Each structure stands twice: as structure tokens, then as C-alpha cells.
């Protein structure tokens, strides 16, 4: 079992607003070995030169000392992409369609924001780890087939789905291999 921060009880997971995130939390916690460290609901404030400070957040950051880190954005329910409009949406249990933020862009921005945030710290810069592997992926735990959502900017390897909840290690290995 991996280390996951923060460590939540089953009661706390049941109270999360996103049960999709709770599903992925349990899968990563129980399915990754000890050499991984997973951070859940990571937030930051980032200021770039003359710009205003901006808040950021990612659902999961999966870290490995030899592999690097991957930022994962999770979306629950039926998730789809309308290629004619470029819009992402979810479908709830009442079959209602809801526009959602682009999860691919969210994960991509998180990947670079975390790198920028780390580079703010002299201790990190002193480590000379400029080439740490970093990647991004999305996880849709209520979707059965990742291939249906594959796009040029998000190949199916980088899309976790319901079947990957049963073997998250294989999926994470494939994600790191894609970026490595």
C-alpha cells in the first residue's frame, strides 16, 4: 500500500463531494506499492513575474523517486467530448448533460504550475533536478472505455477509466512510460 497524503478514513471519503475522486483515492491507496507517494487535492498560489497571483489545484499528484510525477484530473459520471464544439461535458444519473472544465487542460496546467512552484524554492533548484519527468493524465472512473475519449492531445494510455480502478499500478506504469 502506498503513502497517500492526506490520509483519509472511509468515513471521510464517503463525505467527499466527488465520489469519483473517492474511487480513485481508494484505488491508488490500495493498488500502488510503497515506493509511490500520492498527494490528494493539491492546491497552490502561483505568481508569474508581473502577473496577478493565481490559484491552482489538481486532484492527484502521483510521485515516484525514479520516475518523476504525474498530475491527474478526475471527472465523475458519464464524461464526453463534443468534437464539433470542443466542449467537455458530464452526464449525471438523471441523464442531464452538464458542461465541465476541460480536464486535459486542467491536468496540463497543473503539471507546469507544480514545476514552477517547485522552482520558487532555492532548495529545489539546488538539487539540479530540472529534468524530472513530469506528466499529466485524466481519470474517469465511471467511464467504461477510454478509447471513446481518446484525442490527439490525450491518447487512451493517459485516460484512466473504470477498469483501471482494479489495477491502478498497470495504468500508472503506462502513464509514466508514455511520458518517459
Regions found by a protein language model. Name each.
Residues 1-180:
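Intrinsically disordered, low-complexity Ser/Thr/Pro/Gly-rich regulatory segments
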